[in-house]
UniProtKB/Swiss-Prot annotation:
Coiled coil: none
Similarity comment: family membership: To M.jannaschii MJ0361.
Protein name: Uncharacterized protein MJ0944
Lineage: Archaea, Methanobacteriati, Methanobacteriota, Methanomada group, Methanococci
Gene3D superfamilies hit by this protein: Winged helix-like DNA-binding domain superfamily/Winged helix DNA-binding domain
A Pfam family that the UniProt record links to this protein: PadR
InterPro entries: Tscrpt_reg_PadR_N (IPR005149), WH-like_DNA-bd_sf (IPR036388), WH_DNA-bd_sf (IPR036390)
Organism: Methanocaldococcus jannaschii (strain ATCC 43067 / DSM 2661 / JAL-1 / JCM 10045 / NBRC 100440) (Methanococcus jannaschii)
Amino acid sequence: MLIGILSKKYVKEILELLNEKGELHFSQIHKEIPTHMSSLNRTLNELVKLGLISKRKEDNKQALPKTYYKLTPLGKKALLLYEVEKIIENSKNNQNIIIQIINGKNHNIINAKIVNIHNK
């Protein structure tokens, strides 16, 4: 389930890292994410299974091939949910929130407008 995985520890950081840096191999991700290798591997595999990131192996004739991970278009959309969460958490109880998500070919934008109920 998408919401379930997005609430797991380090998922937001992994998605943001891949969004910022592009394709990274496992050890590059591990340098940035302070968790056990087995936990990171499990989380990355869950993200791959849900289609939020893609995975490819590069066989460079060494003992172990490097595994690379990259954010998918669905993963970029999932990052928008963190923005929506932030907007909702920062709103006051007596206000309605109007959220417009624009997902164009080359951009993702969230416009949020907080409207006071009493002014309607």
